[in-house]
């Protein structure tokens, strides 16, 4: 374990510019994906030079975002995600200088952001709002039938994850929003007039919370209940606006940190960006070629399964009128 950590740290130091693979920009954000945005902000807070590559191949893939550096790749679905990987491997840890007596508060605050606020955001994105927001982030590059099926599947999965049924929908909605508002209240008191949540230096909790706030303020519609709750806390909104200028101004002026190049593959890749040439070692190139074959096979399998899903869906729903299908998406329950 120590040897692996040492190797990863050495690869990180040796690579002049890292590559963050994320979903595409939208809503004035360098990546509109609520999972990718905190990873990007964490790297910016740590002043890490990196380029952004956009992945559009697998809208339901859970390994995105990921960071490439040297021969190493930190995937979102491994070791707790990109941020946790960088901390665990002692590569980039913004909490290392935090006083030890602050750790209990940091962990409880992080849990609140990762549960109450994350649940509320998922609820609004997939259950409450219309399909346009998720469409822009995940499905706009897919054909209409596949995009619609994937959105329906994700909505169903989120409702199951949050324990929402037709019988308890109103009760669960009240609970989700009550917890989110309580979280905003606690975070507002925690932030106060400080620069960051835990003093004058950022932590991973700041990156997670800032990603949440920027998404809510920029991506969710004006009718969003979550957005209206957040806007009641001026210091939280001001914090987000200030950090957006400091950390994301480069994206609005030049299109990204060095580069924001599109990628049609979810395969870890090396490319050229801003004059930087990424040339993997011969051995690494051979390993990546084998991985690429697997990813291409996965692509074919993905497309085939989605085609079958569309055909099955059309057969099942062939006798159902469109308004009824829309009701299923809108999730408007009647007593």
Question: PLM ranges: what are they?
Answer:
Residues 200-218:
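GST superfamily/GST-like fold recognition
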Residues 190, 212-254, 316-328:
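Short His-centered aromatic/hydrophobic patch
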Residues 52-58, 202, 255-259:
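Acidic carboxylate-rich catalytic motifs and surrounding loops in phosphoryl-/glycosyl-chemistry enzymes
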Residues 146-164:
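A structural motif
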Residues 227-228, 237-291:
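Juxtamembrane amphipathic/hinge helix adjacent to a transmembrane helix
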Residues 161-196, 200:
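A mid-sequence, solvent-exposed acidic-amphipathic segment
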Residues 38, 42-45, 179-186, 190, ...:
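Amphipathic alpha-helical segments that form well-ordered structural scaffolds
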Residues 2-151, 197, 281-283, 287-335:
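GST-like domain detector, emphasizing the conserved glutathione-binding G-site
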């Amino acid at each position: 374990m120590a040897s692996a950590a040492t190797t990863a740290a050495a690869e990180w130091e040796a690579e002049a510019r890292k590559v963050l693979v994320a979903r595409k920009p939208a809503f004035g954000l360098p990546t509109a994906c609520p999972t990718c945005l905190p990873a990007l902000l964490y790297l910016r807070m740590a002043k890490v030079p990196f380029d952004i590559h956009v992945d559009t191949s697998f809208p339901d893939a859970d390994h995105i975002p990921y960071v490439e550096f040297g021969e190493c790749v930190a995937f979102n679905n491994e070791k707790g995600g990109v941020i946790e990987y960088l901390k665990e491997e002692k590569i980039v840890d913004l909490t290392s200088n935090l006083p030890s007596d602050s750790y209990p508060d940091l962990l409880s605050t992080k849990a609140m952001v990762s549960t109450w606020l994350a649940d509320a955001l998922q609820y609004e994105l997939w259950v409450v709002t219309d399909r346009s927001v998720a469409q822009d982030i995940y499905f706009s590059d897919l054909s209409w039938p596949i995009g619609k099926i994937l959105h329906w599947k994700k909505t169903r999965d989120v409702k199951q994850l949050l324990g929402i049924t037709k019988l308890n929908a109103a009760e669960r909605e009240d609970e989700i929003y009550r917890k989110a508002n309580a979280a905003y209240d606690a975070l507002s008191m925690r932030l106060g007039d400080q620069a960051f949540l835990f003093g004058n230096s950022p932590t991973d909790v700041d990156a997670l919370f800032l990603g949440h706030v920027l998404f809510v303020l920029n991506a969710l519609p004006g009718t969003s209940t979550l957005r209206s709750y957040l806007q009641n806390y001026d210091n939280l909104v001001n914090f987000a606006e200030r950090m957006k200028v400091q950390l994301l101004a480069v994206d609005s002026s030049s299109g990204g940190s060095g580069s924001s190049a599109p990628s049609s593959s979810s395969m870890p890749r090396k490319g050229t960006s801003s004059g930087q040439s990424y040339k993997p070692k011969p051995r690494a190139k051979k390993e990546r070629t084998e991985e690429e074959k697997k990813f291409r096979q996965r692509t074919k399998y993905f497309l085939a399964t989605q085609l079958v899903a569309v055909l099955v869906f059309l057969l099942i729903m062939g006798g159902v009128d469109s308004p009824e299908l829309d009701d299923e998406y809108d999730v408007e329950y009647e007593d």
